[in-house]
């Protein structure tokens, strides 16, 4: 959802769009003019790389030394997703070399501490923000409605596809705690 929204905005600036997502719907990507590529092609070809992935066992540390070194001189890495997706030490090292630029608002430890080494980097090459990009009136309204809809669906016995771990129903605690709501 976030990636598609970003792609639509980038298209307005006539950007050439490529993406790496092993689970992407090719037809949707084609309809938006997005070329799907492998991760190394994305890293080596892009002027801007925006990370919008979820943290899963497959994505933790997906951007490391090899991927960062593949980036073009002065390309910009943008991370508004989660810090765990990028190897922090590798990112710090390449930023100290001055090869790439970066903008990010996610940290291994939030809020950022005053002695964080990223604070010593050249502010013309690195934009550091607190984790707040998702805070907008529209986002808050969307999440509030989605939460209410999910609760109503749950109480009506409807699985609307938003249950991340379907095995939760097999956990004994669900019978004792979840069942209280379910049987109400």
Specify the residue positions occupied by each region the protein language model found.
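Hydrophobic/small residue at the entry helix of a nucleotide-binding pocket
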Residues: 2
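Residues at the starts of beta-strands that form the adenosine-phosphate
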Residues: 7, 15-16
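Rossmann-like adenosine-cofactor binding region
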Residues: 22-117
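Rossmann-like dinucleotide-binding domain for NAD(H)/NADP(H)
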Residues: 74-184
């Amino acid at each position: 959802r976030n990636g598609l929204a970003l792609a639509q905005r980038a298209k307005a600036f006539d950007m050439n769009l490529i993406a790496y997502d092993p689970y992407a719907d090719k037809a949707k990507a084609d309809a938006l003019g997005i070329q799907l590529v492998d991760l190394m092609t994305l890293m080596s070809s892009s002027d801007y790389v925006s990370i919008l992935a979820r943290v899963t066992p497959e994505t933790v540390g997906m951007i490391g030394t090899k991927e960062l070194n593949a980036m073009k001189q002065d390309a910009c890495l943008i991370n508004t997703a989660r810090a765990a997706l990028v190897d922090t030490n590798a990112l710090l090292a390449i930023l100290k070399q001055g090869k790439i630029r970066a903008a990010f608002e996610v940290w291994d430890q939030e809020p950022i501490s005053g002695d964080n080494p990223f604070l010593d980097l050249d502010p013309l090459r690195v934009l550091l923000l607190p984790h707040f990009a998702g805070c907008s009136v529209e986002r808050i309204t969307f999440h509030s409605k989605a939460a209410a809809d999910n609760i109503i669906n749950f109480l009506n016995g409807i699985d609307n596809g938003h249950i991340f771990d379907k095995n939760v129903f097999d956990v004994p605690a669900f019978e004792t705690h979840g069942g209280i709501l379910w049987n109400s």
